[in-house]
Amino acid sequence: MTQLSSNDVPSMGRRQFMNLLTFGTATGVALGALYPVANYFMPLRAGGGGGGTSAKDELGNPVTKTGWLATHQAGDRSLVQGLKGDPTYLIVNEGGEIGEFGLNAICTHLGCVVPWDSGANKFICPCHGSQYDTNGKVVRGPAPLSLALAHVDIEDDAVLVKQWSETDFRTNENPWWA
């Protein structure tokens, strides 16, 4: 058996450093991979005790009631970023106030964003022609289901979008999206 010279054997300090570097790198990668999973199950909430998500405009700024009503008239249906970042329609009712519900703008057929057609007074999907009435109820397929509902609340002038889990008032059935 041959003996290695002391120059060929790495010092304990260098070995410990390499072990620490390897462990630190592996830990960093593992924690980085777990962050999106943890964020999915425990999403960040908007300020306030209600637990809603702050509606955001096309620039990512929080929507306020006074700012929204200053630029949107009665009957308007315009997109904001709502729950889970999905495009959501805020509805200004005929009384000039923001409605108590919003509509998720994702078509229930293939997931296209459904634009509001003010001339036809309904939502018409550009992908396959599904149509939804003013409240998001499907009136013409191939979409099988109505647009998902979301609660819209005003807290200190901030517009909050919250999960809808009650009976769907359009169909009197349990919500398919909850």
From Swiss-Prot:
Its EC number is 7.1.1.6. Residues 65-161 form the Rieske domain. Its cofactor is [2Fe-2S] cluster. Its main location: membrane. It catalyses: 2 oxidized [plastocyanin] + a plastoquinol + 2 H(+)(in) = 2 reduced [plastocyanin] + a plastoquinone + 4 H(+)(out). NCBIfam families: Cytb6fFeSPetC (NF045928), PRK13474.1 (NF010001). The 4 large subunits of the cytochrome b6-f complex are cytochrome b6, subunit IV (17 kDa polypeptide, PetD), cytochrome f and the Rieske protein, while the 4 small subunits are PetG, PetL, PetM and PetN. The complex functions as a dimer. This is Cytochrome b6-f complex iron-sulfur subunit. The lineage of its organism: Bacteria, Bacillati, Cyanobacteriota, Cyanophyceae, Synechococcales.
